């Protein structure tokens, strides 16, 4: 399976490419919509600033709506309606607003337990690696699949159809993260 990793040109996507390869995919870097049209699935990685990433990601909205998509950290945040960071608009795939997190330490860095609240073929409960200063507050929403508890609850994963977003970094989450990527690939092949 060929998986296109969107390159926002503002961060390192090497660990995502390596994790996809370890999970059995053939990862390729995509910088344009035309290139993305030739892949089987898409990854919106979690690197860069919201403003810079959104400028490129909005070109990929139709691709995200059509192809299996895994959005990681910043990639997941781009799927929401808006963000406090950079005062930016989001892609509006999911309802919600990205805000600066309330936690004892910001950014939230490290392994945190992720609580799953609805059945998912892809998201499993357990410890994942987080690195973020912004997030979406937990609330009632059928797409919200998992949460992380800091000073408040924040969305850890969203899911609707073929679109999956995770606030954590599966590519840095050891075996647990690799298994999540494998499950994403298995579902994407259907």
Curated annotation (Swiss-Prot):
Cellular component GO terms, alphabetical: cytoplasm
Catalytic reactions on record: 5-[(5-phospho-1-deoxy-D-ribulos-1-ylimino)methylamino]-1-(5-phospho-beta-D-ribosyl)imidazole-4-carboxamide + L-glutamine = D-erythro-1-(imidazol-4-yl)glycerol 3-phosphate + 5-amino-1-(5-phospho-beta-D-ribosyl)imidazole-4-carboxamide + L-glutamate + H(+); L-glutamine + H2O = L-glutamate + NH4(+)
Catalytic machinery residues: 73 (nucleophile), 169, 171
Any Pfam family: GATase
Main subcellular location: cytoplasm
The UniProt record lists the keyword S-adenosyl-L-methionine: no
Segments traversing the membrane: none
GO molecular function, one term: imidazoleglycerol-phosphate synthase activity
Enzyme Commission number(s) of this protein: 4.3.2.10, 3.5.1.2
GO BP, sorted A to Z: L-histidine biosynthetic process
Localization: Cytoplasm
Assembly with partners or alone: Heterodimer of HisH and HisF.
Its biological purpose: IGPS catalyzes the conversion of PRFAR and glutamine to IGP, AICAR and glutamate. The HisH subunit catalyzes the hydrolysis of glutamine to glutamate and ammonia as part of the synthesis of IGP and AICAR. The resulting ammonia molecule is channeled to the active site of HisF.
Protein name: Imidazole glycerol phosphate synthase subunit HisH
